Amino acid sequence: MLFSLRELVQWLGFATFEIFVHLLALLVFSVLLALRVDGLTPGLSWWNVFVPFFAADGLSTYFTTIVSVRLFQDGEKRLAVLRLFWVLTVLSLKFVFEMLLCQKLVEQTRELWFGLITSPVFILLQLLMIRACRVN
């Protein structure tokens, strides 16, 4: 079952442009990941592979701040605060997951076990389920 763009915007709370930025980051990340795993670029570190995701998170945070300020100026204070809170929560959990995964791939430490690394994703999925029930 595929979701329409309207449903994705409604459930995720992101604007269409933000979804496009994250999909573009996923495409660039996939290319860099394939290059890194195949060993075609020996100087490419895991931190460089994850740069598209970090850039997309930064651009999305910047865009959300601008939209929230504009909503606040237009008198939509409640909507501005709720949107800012929701999107920053989603982006923070995504960013923590990316940082922990990248650190695990670089250092290969035993202190970072995969249950700890994926815990932000599970929290995010629970929040998305709650939001999906509230939206409908």
Swiss-Prot record:
One of the GO biological process terms: spermatogenesis
Cellular compartment(s): Endoplasmic reticulum membrane; Endoplasmic reticulum-Golgi intermediate compartment; Lysosome membrane
Swiss-Prot/TrEMBL keywords: Endoplasmic reticulum, Lysosome, Membrane, Transmembrane, Transmembrane helix
Region (Interaction with STING1): 1-51
Major localisation: endoplasmic reticulum
Consequences of knocking out this gene: Male mutants are sterile and exhibit a profound defect in spermatogenesis and spermagiogenesis.
Chain positions covered by the region annotation Required for lysosomal localization of the STING-TMEM203 complex: 52-136
Transmembrane residue ranges: 14-34, 50-72, 81-101, 112-132
InterPro entries: TM_Fragile-X-F-assoc
UniProt protein name: Transmembrane protein 203
Gene behind this protein: Tmem203
Keyword Transmembrane: yes
Organism of this sequence: Mus musculus
UniProt keyword Heme, yes or no: no
